[in-house]
Amino acid sequence: MWQRVKDSQKLDVNSTYCYIMLSEYFTDTCLVAEIDKEIVGFVTSLIRPSNPEVLFVWQIAVSTEYQGKGIAYSLLRDLITGASCTQVRYIETTISPNNAASNRLFRKFAVEIDAPLLESEGFSSHLFPGDIHEDERLIQIGPINHKFGGINS
């Protein structure tokens, strides 16, 4: 996962330890896509402890050579239709304006499941170290009807 993030050149690279911890302790809400035993994509997320109806998607990435093949969309769909997300009514994530791929992915997902997408202030750039980080916009999709829009859980 760490390598996929590093290769993306769009996502914030966290420590390898962080990705190991996510894989170990959030297995219900973190998925990988493998081809020939190589991780070609992943999604990390968690259900908000303060609101179990909200799934926060932290990062989603796909290897450059596999982008545009629907892997990120499939990961997101598999995640939201999984057993651990049956109570989830909203998906939230933060995206920087220059991350066109993530912006397209979440907008497409909202349309496909026929759920509203709201955009609001997320995390201001001044919260991040250095001068190179953009503001992160908060994206919220929902409410999600698991029996509507093609999602069957």
Task: Give, region by region, the residue ranges found by the protein language model.
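Short amphipathic alpha-helix that is part of the acyltransferase structural core
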Residues: 1-14, 34, 152
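A short helix-loop-beta-strand connector motif used in the catalytic cores of GNAT acetyltransferases and
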Residues: 21-32, 53
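Conserved beta-strand in the GNAT
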Residues: 32, 38-47, 54-56, 61
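A conserved beta-turn-beta hairpin within the catalytic core of GNAT-like acetyltransferases
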Residues: 48-57, 67, 86-87
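A short, internal acetyl-CoA/4′-phosphopantetheine-binding micro-motif in the GNAT/acyltransferase core
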Residues: 59-67, 95-96
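Conserved acetyl-CoA-binding loop-helix of GNAT-fold acetyltransferases
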Residues: 62, 68-82, 104, 108
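Conserved active-site alpha-helix within GNAT-family acetyltransferase domains
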Residues: 73, 97-121
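Conserved GNAT acetyl-CoA-binding A-motif
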Residues: 83-97, 105
